[in-house]
Amino acid sequence: MKFGRKIVMDKVKVTYQYLLFVWRRSEQDNIKVPAGHLAYVTLLSIVPLLAVIFYMLAAFPVFSDLKGMLEDLIYNNLLPTSGDTIQEHISGFIENTKKMSMMGIGSLIAIALLLISTIDQTINRIWRCTNKRSRIQSFTIYWTILSLGPVIIGASLALSSYLFSVFQEHGSLSFGQRLLSLMPFILTWLTFAGVYTLVPHQRVSFRYALIGGLIAAILFFFGTDLFRLYITNFPSQQIIYGALAVIPILFVWIYYSWLIVLIGAEVTATLEEFLKQQEDNNVTKEYLGADI
């Protein structure tokens, strides 16, 4: 009984030490500053990025029926309480981009690539990566993300629709609905894990990326509910800013979202380092015990 209690207390102690380790590392990296930078760049590039995504999907007729579903997914997660308002404004902006010249479209792509580049630099700063990719290699990777990302999103939505139809045909609609209700969380989790695995310029254990991605996904969806509750019960922003309230609210939400992404990155980056330190400490204790 005492042995089992000791194991539990040791695990609690290690967990506390790790949380303290992550906190200190986050303070050292001052992640609030890059989160604000990413939020600002996101506001600048959100219309170009969505325009590029929808252009890419339009190139594949198989995804044409999924455009509405994708829009709902993006706008509902973009701001939990004002999805319809944001969708109306951004859709109008995207429609305006169709009137642009080739030079204008090129500038849209450049702004979208700027966001991806900023994400890449911020994540690698957390990992303390010293080796850098060449400009050509970086551009190739950014362009691949920009071109294949919408296709992967479209394929995921198509798979969700297919699974729903299969469950419906076999009379397992309630199970299918429960499964599909988890799809946004699962996709968010895997997206975070994919970012933490692929973006750093070094090898990252996918197991640690899954842990960091899970924590980020939980915080993201918890924050979504909390944010919705706050906006619904304390509508001070709407009273002060009126119709313009969506702008500061959108910025705060994007800032929070990037803060969560960076917290998940800190968790993933520090897991291996912390466990290595614990292992070294245990080896040292065993050595000292044997020496005594």
From Swiss-Prot:
Keywords, sorted A to Z: Cell inner membrane, Cell membrane, Membrane, Transmembrane, Transmembrane helix
InterPro entries given in the database record: UPF0761_bac, Virul_fac_BrkB
Membrane topology of this protein: Multi-pass membrane protein
Listed transmembrane segments: 43-63, 100-120, 139-159, 179-199, 209-229, 243-263
Organism domain of life: Bacteria
A Pfam family this chain is assigned to: Virul_fac_BrkB
Localization per Swiss-Prot or TrEMBL: Cell inner membrane
GO cellular component: plasma membrane
Assigned protein family: Belongs to the UPF0761 family.
Protein name per the record: UPF0761 membrane protein Ping_3482
Annotated source species: Psychromonas ingrahamii (strain DSM 17664 / CCUG 51855 / 37)
